[in-house]
């Protein structure tokens, strides 16, 4: 699995639309759409919000975090 698929999995596991997920983590709908399509990656602030969301909803976060670190190292 790759980063875009993992973001989408986290969102879908919570039964949220892209708009709802964006509202919860404090970003624009278009931002979530770009993450899920692989056109961009979250910054550190967004990753912290996603982490908080995952912890609050008992969703594993570690895989997403590893993908994000790998992306930052490759960049």
Describe each PLM feature range.
Residues 1-13, 48-51:
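A short, Lys/Arg-rich alpha-helix, primarily the initiator
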Residues 6, 31-34, 46:
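Residue-level recognition of specific faces of alpha-helices
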Residues 8, 12, 26, 37-39, ...:
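Residue-level detection of the helix-turn-helix DNA-binding "recognition helix"
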